[in-house]
């Protein structure tokens, strides 16, 4: 092994130098592919395929980091691992992006035609796939690119067709006329979960609907007067006495001068508004149901682009919102508008284009969901089919959605996607559904619509493994997959659909565990979004701090299922942690002497610090294994941090210096082995989270194997268990910290020798402190060191209480008593003034109402800090006044 020098391991951690080129080395070494070891247990994850709509955001970075930790850890635990990458064509989202780009060039998709437009989308896909690949590489994701899939691949298209055809033949896919959510900009139907509801300003328009016999009118309140031309009835509740004698009579529909009946239906809420509602079966899902019950005509008044059609009379050709204004003006002119009542109400908007969604009568393809949902709900009671949600509470979210499910509209009026495998006979209108086109294709026309993106995504865990070929090697070896990692926001969109499709077509759960994480928010707790301009590009963070620091932040700041707030301060703290590891690694490696092969520590050579170190390492390994198995990566990170910083760096490395710089060659050789082994183990433990830096450092240590990526994971060793050493070192460290704390308060530097008196309440500590005095004294620099149960408390002494003892350090020789009292009195007064100043702000209602929430929170934090400082200062002053 080449000796460590400034050339082989730089004096200072430089994340750019460490990470540059390392990913390509891993790819060249082929370490991300499955091992192929048939004796090893398989473990597989399929990546939630990112949309090819653009660059990956911080949520993707979080999601994929969690997956990478799982797969890297399982790989070095000895599993035959597969992490399968891929991307989603994202039908409406990608098409909307490309159409927006074309609009800037003054072109529409209709100008190009379907074939040329789809080619443009493929070009977009290729461009952003390269971007995503680059981002995956920067993140250090250990993906097997030889198995990468795309949701429009030929193989996946075969799976999609197979599922569609089978569900159709089973009577679970049907085509029918129904009210759907309609996006007028994308000109396509949307499922309920593709609609986002926002509070918008609107109005209740109170309109007179005159009786046909001229005897008066009924008052109707509507938020959507533009749909009036599609009204076919007015409905009242059967028990509403106000209208009992009116049921069956006719009204004149304003503006249309068409007669419509008054009907009674239990759907109407008699307490809401006037208790009478207009029924528009072609423009409202509830009205559609009422219309079916009463055999009402369905009059669609809108085109697919949101303009009014021929059924809208003189308003034909107007945009829907222009038509609203025109109709309201005409109603007012005709004396039929009673009043306009401003309101704020929840209005559905397209998730992708942002436009207001229309409820529109349309012929679409649907999946009959009840039988599929019932089977999936039942499977949660069967141990071999149950999907375990982590955290468990999200199983309720999943089941609640499944129990209240509606039929799923799966057709989309788009050009980018899986075209529906249905053909209509040009002469007879007969429908044919099949894997292949009819042989006499000249007599048939294929349905122009494509399938909802989520239809193909729902098949992702098994379609990527070669299904419907159940003899495909990957399907047989790696399906069902083991763990899905995803956000709670797409449990209904994606998780639920993968489960019911997996159960229906493979008769197995698609994954055993689904690890749910929250949303990535900004430092103020707001969801990151384009509209707020608060999104953070993970590549910018990597440029400044490195992928390892970002990855460490992403897993240590939260628990499963919780949202997390992005914090540059915490990413910087992660970088500082890595820098600490770098520094102790350099120290260890530059003090290994001629040790050039890895060796096992020999417990027979251990001093107390060695026994303690390896007992702590053993416990850390056990905790990490337990926490990672439960996906508690945040707690796992804190456990690793504690060992690395508080055990190895702060104490053991410092303890080792006396031996390493001494003359006992045998002791030095043993200490080198112990340092190298401990560092090797912690690098292996940290590698799944921070692969770049720990891969680099591990290669500089004595090692076997070509890469830390495939190096075996640490295993707890019972020979290292030592409760006595742990309790002894805990007491010694507490003693050292206690003395240091007294020194700090007294302003006495370590170079100044002090008397130390330790009064014991636990006599068992006496031999521990006395036998390890030489070691303790290196950290406390005592002039005299007295330990016993009968030690008297000296006057004017600083003190600290630890488990089993009280420490005293006489201060009379260290400080000027009067000068220190004066200083503390002055400090206390200044702190009281600061607290009073903040209280004045916090008691000012003007400040509280106008200042940003973050500013108010900062003032409260400052006040709390000042309170703590004041308490400490007063306690110190009281201590000196008693002396």
From Swiss-Prot:
A motif ('HIGH' region) lies at residues 50-60. It is found in: Cytoplasm. Keywords: Aminoacyl-tRNA synthetase, ATP-binding, Coiled coil, Cytoplasm, Ligase, Nucleotide-binding, Protein biosynthesis. GO terms for biological process: valyl-tRNA aminoacylation. Residues 859-883 are annotated as: Disordered. The keyword Endoplasmic reticulum does not apply. Its main location: cytoplasm. It is an enzyme of class 6 (ligase). GO terms for molecular function: aminoacyl-tRNA deacylase activity; ATP binding; valine-tRNA ligase activity. Gene3D superfamilies: HUPs, Isoleucyl-tRNA Synthetase, Domain 1, Valyl-tRNA synthetase, C-terminal domain, Valyl/Leucyl/Isoleucyl-tRNA synthetase, editing domain. GO terms for cellular component: cytosol. Residues 811-883 form a coiled coil. ValRS has two distinct active sites: one for aminoacylation and one for editing. The misactivated threonine is translocated from the active site to the editing site. Belongs to the class-I aminoacyl-tRNA synthetase family. ValS type 1 subfamily. Catalyzes the attachment of valine to tRNA(Val). As ValRS can inadvertently accommodate and process structurally similar amino acids such as threonine, to avoid such errors, it has a 'posttransfer' editing activity that hydrolyzes mischarged Thr-tRNA(Val) in a tRNA-dependent manner. HAMAP family: Val_tRNA_synth_type1 (MF_02004). This is Valine--tRNA ligase. The gene is valS.
């Amino acid at each position: 092994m080449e000796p460590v020098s400034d050339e082989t391991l730089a004096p200072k951690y430089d994340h750019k130098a460490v990470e540059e080129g390392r990913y390509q080395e891993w790819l060249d070494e082929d370490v991300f592919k499955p091992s192929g070891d048939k004796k090893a247990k398989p473990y597989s994850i399929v990546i939630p395929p990112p949309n090819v709509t653009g660059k990956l955001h911080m949520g993707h970075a979080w999601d994929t980091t969690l997956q990478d930790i799982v797969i890297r850890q399982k790989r070095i635990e000895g599993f035959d691992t597969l992490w399968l990458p891929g991307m989603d064509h994202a039908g409406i989202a990608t098409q909307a992006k490309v159409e927006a780009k074309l609009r800037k060039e003054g072109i529409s998709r209709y100008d190009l035609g379907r074939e040329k437009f789809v080619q443009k989308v493929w070009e977009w896909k290729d461009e952003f796939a390269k971007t995503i690949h680059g981002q995956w590489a920067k993140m250090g994701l250990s993906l097997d690119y030889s198995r990468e899939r795309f949701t429009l691949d030929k193989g996946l298209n075969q799976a999609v067709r197979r599922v569609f055809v089978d569900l159709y033949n089973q009577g679970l896919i049907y085509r029918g006329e129904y009210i759907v959510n309609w996006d007028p900009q994308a000109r396509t139907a949307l499922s309920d979960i593709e609609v986002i509801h926002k509070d918008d300003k609107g109005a209740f328009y109170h309109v007179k609907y005159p009786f046909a016999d001229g005897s008066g009118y009924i008052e109707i309140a509507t938020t959507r007067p533009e749909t009036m031309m599609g009204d076919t009835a007015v409905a009242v509740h059967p028990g509403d006495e106000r209208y009992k004698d009116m049921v069956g009579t006719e009204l004149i529909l304003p503006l249309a001068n068409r007669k419509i009946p008054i009907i009674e239906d239990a759907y109407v809420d008699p307490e809401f508004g006037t208790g009478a509602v207009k029924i528009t079966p072609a423009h409202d899902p509830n009205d559609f149901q009422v219309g079916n019950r009463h055999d009402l005509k369905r009059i669609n008044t809108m085109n697919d682009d949101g303009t009014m059609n021929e059924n809208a009379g003189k308003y034909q050709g107007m945009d829907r919102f222009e038509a609203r204004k025109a109709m309201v003006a005409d109603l007012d002119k005709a004396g039929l508008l009673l009043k306009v009542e401003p309101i704020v109400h929840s209005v559905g908007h397209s998730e992708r284009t942002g436009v207001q969604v229309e409820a529109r009568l349309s012929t679409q393809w649907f999946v009959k969901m009840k039988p599929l949902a019932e089977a999936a709900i039942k499977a949660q009671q069967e141990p071999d089919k149950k999907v375990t949600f982590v955290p468990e509470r999200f199983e309720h979210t999943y089941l609640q959605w499944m129990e209240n499910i509606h039929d799923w509209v799966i057709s989309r009026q788009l050009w980018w996607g899986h075209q529906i495998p249905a053909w209509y006979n040009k002469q007879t209108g007969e429908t044919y559904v099949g894997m292949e086109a009819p042989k006499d294709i000249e007599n048939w026309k294929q349905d122009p619509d494509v399938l909802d993106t989520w239809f193909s995504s729902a098949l992702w865990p098994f379609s990527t493994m070669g299904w419907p070929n159940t003899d495909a090697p990957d399907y047989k070896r790696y399906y069902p997959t083991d763990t899905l990692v995803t956000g709670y926001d797409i449990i209904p969109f994606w998780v639920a659909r993968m489960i019911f499709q997996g159960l229906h077509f493979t008769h197995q759960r698609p994954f055993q565990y689904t690890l749910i994480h929250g949303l990535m928010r900004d430092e103020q707790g707001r969801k990151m979004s384009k509209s707020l301009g608060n999104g953070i590009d993970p590549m910018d963070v990597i440029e400044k701090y490195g992928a390892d620091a970002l990855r460490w932040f992403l897993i240590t700041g939260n628990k499963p299922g919780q949202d997390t707030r992005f914090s540059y301060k915490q990413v910087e703290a992660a970088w500082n942690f890595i820098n600490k590891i770098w520094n102790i690694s350099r120290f260890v490696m530059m003090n290994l002497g001629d040790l050039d092969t890895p060796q096992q520590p020999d417990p027979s050579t251990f001093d107390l610090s060695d026994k303690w170190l390896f007992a702590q390492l053993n416990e850390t390994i056990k905790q990490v294994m337990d926490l990672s198995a439960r996906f508690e990566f945040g707690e796992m990170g804190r456990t690793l941090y504690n060992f690395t910083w508080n055990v190895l760096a702060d104490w053991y490395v410092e303890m080792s210096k006396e031996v390493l710089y001494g003359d006992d060659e045998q002791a030095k050789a043993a200490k080198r082995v112990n340092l190298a082994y401990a560092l090797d183990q912690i690098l292996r433990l940290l590698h799944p989270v921070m692969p770049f830096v720990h891969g680099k450092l591990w290669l500089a240590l004595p090692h076997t194997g070509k890469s830390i990526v495939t190096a075996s994971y640490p295993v707890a060793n019972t020979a290292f268990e030592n409760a006595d050493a742990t309790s002894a070192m805990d007491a010694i460290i507490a003693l050292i910290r206690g003395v240091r704390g007294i020194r700090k308060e007294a302003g006495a530097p370590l170079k100044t020798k002090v008397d130390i008196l330790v009064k014991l309440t636990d006599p068992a500590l006496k031999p521990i402190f006395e036998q390890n005095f030489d070691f303790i004294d290196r950290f406390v620099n005592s002039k005299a060191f007295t330990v016993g149960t009968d030690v008297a408390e000296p006057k004017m002494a600083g003190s600290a209480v630890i488990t089993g003892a009280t420490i005293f350090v006489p201060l009379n020789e260290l400080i000027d008593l009067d000068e220190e009292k004066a200083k503390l009195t002055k400090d206390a007064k200044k702190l009281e003034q600061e607290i009073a100043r903040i209280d004045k702000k916090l008691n000012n209602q003007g400040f509280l109402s106008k200042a940003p929430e973050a500013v108010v929170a900062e003032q409260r934090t400052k006040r709390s800090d000042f309170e703590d400082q004041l308490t400490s200062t007063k306690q110190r002053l009281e201590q000196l006044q008693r002396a």
